[in-house]
A protein has these predicted regions:
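Short, well-structured active-site flanking segments
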Residues: 125-128
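N-terminal beta1-alpha1 cap of cysteine-dependent amidohydrolase-like domains
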Residues: 1-111, 131-142, 147-157, 169, ...
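Active-site-proximal beta-strand elements of phosphoester/diester hydrolases
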Residues: 204-207
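Gly/Ala-rich beta-loop-alpha elbow adjacent to hydrolase catalytic centers
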Residues: 110, 114, 119, 123
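Short, basic/aromatic recognition patches
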Residues: 166
Length: 231
């Protein structure tokens, strides 16, 4: 049986030993999650947006990973966040990937920044600087609770309520019209997961980091299994 080919967006950072040499990379949990779920993982490096069509044609599904803030110019705002952490070329390339994946009817799964970017690409906006959602605990520590819509695939995996890790200081503000919220933080109503409500788009996005919880609990591996084999 042919394994699904899952394209994982890559980030860029300096090599710690040689800061004049950059690395294209994705955290290994994304690759491990795809592999353990039965898929083949391919990294998609930040590239010219004209190459998005070819990249998407090579894969069966797309995963948008975390990283920098989404440049607020894409939702018609000026930056007023406490950090100036942007990567414009990455935003542009990944928006081209989203557009092509939608055209080619390839499912999309997103995590953290990826979910924020998806919302912006579809016409939504972001809270630029929120509090109490960047934990100072180990990455697999379950930091706060989450309430899940009972009429969602997430509820089949996690139940109506669970706890999640949290590493973000931006979140969805105005929701894109093609999306619906399927999970929130019960304390402050922060959006923690969304899915497509459009028949033309197969999409699931989460705000937490299941790739860091693969050895912590089975639900997060089941999420990757759903993405790789069913989404």
């Amino acid at each position: 049986m042919t394994k699904p080919i899952i394209g994982i967006t890559a980030n860029v950072r300096p090599n710690p030993a040689h800061e004049d040499i950059n690395w294209s990379y994705a955290p290994s949990g994304f690759v491990e999650g795809v592999q353990r779920a039965g898929g083949l993982a391919i990294l998609l490096p930040v590239s010219d947006p004209s190459e998005a069509k070819t990249y998407i044609s090579m894969i069966d599904k797309l995963i948008l990973i975390g990283g920098q803030n989404v440049d607020p110019k894409f939702y018609n705002e000026k930056n007023h966040a406490s950090e100036d952490d942007f990567f414009l070329e990455r935003d542009i390339f990944e928006m081209a990937l989203i557009e092509e994946a939608t055209k080619q009817k390839k499912p999309i799964f997103s995590i953290c920044r990826g979910t924020q970017l998806m919302n912006v690409a579809l016409g939504g906006s972001l809270h630029q600087d929120i509090e109490n959602h960047w934990q100072d605990k180990p990455s697999d520590y379950l930091y706060h609770e989450m309430i899940v819509d009972e009429n969602s695939k997430l509820a089949e995996i996690y139940g109506r309520g669970t706890s999640i890790n949290s590493f973000h200081h931006q979140s969805i503000k105005h929701l894109a019209s093609d999306l619906r919220v399927i999970a929130r933080d019960p304390e402050d109503n922060t959006v923690e997961a969304v899915e497509s409500n459009s028949p033309d788009l197969r999409f699931l996005g989460v705000q937490w980091h299941p790739e860091l919880l693969l050895d912590k609990r089975e639900e997060d591996l089941k999420l990757f299994e759903y993405v790789v084999n069913e989404l």
